[in-house]
């Protein structure tokens, strides 16, 4: 797996100019754990936030979870689903997307962009380029629909980006 990570990071660096950092820690977890990381469920529970019941219910159907993988920029950890297969090209594309975030944060790129969606847009664009270069067909459950992708990648005036407030960078899939 480490060799795959290095190859993908070198590809990203070659297309962005980002320096190649140490590889991130990779943890394989359940889809529910990925969802909990994405929504900050542990923190919501500590704060007795009413959104905990909405986003963090334990009995949710794992197939209804749209988030496939997550990068936590504070810990430098990429969380992949337990079913991740390093030989599957579509799964490699998801890993590449998360590695883009790793390189972005290690290069402090997050400090110069005007909003979080710019990071996401670059990650999706690089993933698309890699998919095209490698002639990969992405299954529907690992893709993001056009409306969700637009929402994730377009900056809005009401959406200032404050780097210290946001440490989990998702890779979403549209399971519907």
Report the location of each language-model feature:
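Soluble non-cytosolic domains of exported or imported proteins
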Residues: 2-3, 85-94, 113-121
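A metal-dependent hydrolase signature that marks the N-terminal structural subdomain at the beginning
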Residues: 1-62
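Substrate-binding clefts and substrate-entry loops adjacent to catalytic sites
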Residues: 80-82, 104-113, 133
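Extracellular/mature segments of secreted proteins
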Residues: 48-52, 56, 64-65, 123, ...
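Active-site recognition of the HExxH zinc-binding catalytic motif
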Residues: 93-106
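Post-HExxH zinc-binding segment in Zn-dependent metallohydrolases
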Residues: 114-147
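Long, well-structured alpha-helical subdomains associated
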Residues: 134-176
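Active-site scaffold of zinc-dependent metalloenzymes
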Residues: 42-89, 102
């Amino acid at each position: 797996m480490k060799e795959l990570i290095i190859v993908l990071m070198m590809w990203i660096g070659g297309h962005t100019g980002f320096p190649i950092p140490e590889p991130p820690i990779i943890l394989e977890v359940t889809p529910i754990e990925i969802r909990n990381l994405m929504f900050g469920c542990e923190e919501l529970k500590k704060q007795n936030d009413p959104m905990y019941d909405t986003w963090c219910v334990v009995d949710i159907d794992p197939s209804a979870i749209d988030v496939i993988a997550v990068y936590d920029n504070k810990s430098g950890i990429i969380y992949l689903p337990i079913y991740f297969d390093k030989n599957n090209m579509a799964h490699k594309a998801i890993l590449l997307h998360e590695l883009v975030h790793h390189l972005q944060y290690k290069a402090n790129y997050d400090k110069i962009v005007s909003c979080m969606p710019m990071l996401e847009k670059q990650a999706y664009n690089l993933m698309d380029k890699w998919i095209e270069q490698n002639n990969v067909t992405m299954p529907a459950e690992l893709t993001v629909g056009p409306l969700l992708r637009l929402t994730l990648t377009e900056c809005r005036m009401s959406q200032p980006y404050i780097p210290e407030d946001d440490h989990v960078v998702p890779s979403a899939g549209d399971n519907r």
